[in-house]
Amino acid sequence: MRYGVALSVVFCIAVGGSEPFPSDPALDEWRAFSRRPEARELINWLRCHARGLMTGNRCDAVLIPRTPPLFGTLGVFITIVKGSAVRGCYGAFDHRAREAEVLLVDYLEGALVRDARYRPLLIHELESAQIILTIASRPRPAGSIEAIDTARHGVFLECDGEARVYVPAEVRAAAELAREARRLNCQVYEFNAVTIR
């Protein structure tokens, strides 16, 4: 499977580290946010915008929950999952948009329609699909994929100049991912992640 990088935007695959990550105040804010009711409101806001993007009927919902900052050192990825199958994932570690609303809707649209690796989600599938937001630290070198706790940390592979991102929501078989990384002679990195469902 091939993953693309364009304008610092990365298509991703979900997974979930070897040594503990140092404390990251920005990621810690998101970790605390993920446990509050506002996190659910954020996912509902994303669902409203997904419905609007899919039907052409604009979502007028305003992003009510005050989210922690998205900019600086954090990556942002949105994954769409239907049943146990990923239907799209899109995001980046560096962002062109500065406003949270614009950034999140852009990455949501990317996950819905710009990730050509997956069959697009149909409107009747939306209500039973999961929309997953992953907030990520910067990748750091990792010894091997087997040493990464893929339930909590993501994997970033650099293979012949191509970036592949695996967020904790997607990867089901780390061993298969490790074989692929060895076969392609990839540099392996890991990143800390907060997942909001």
Explain the meaning of each model-derived region.
Residues 4, 9-23:
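Bacterial Sec-dependent signal peptides at the C-terminal "C-region" and cleavage site
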Residues 19-197:
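Basic nucleic-acid-binding interfaces
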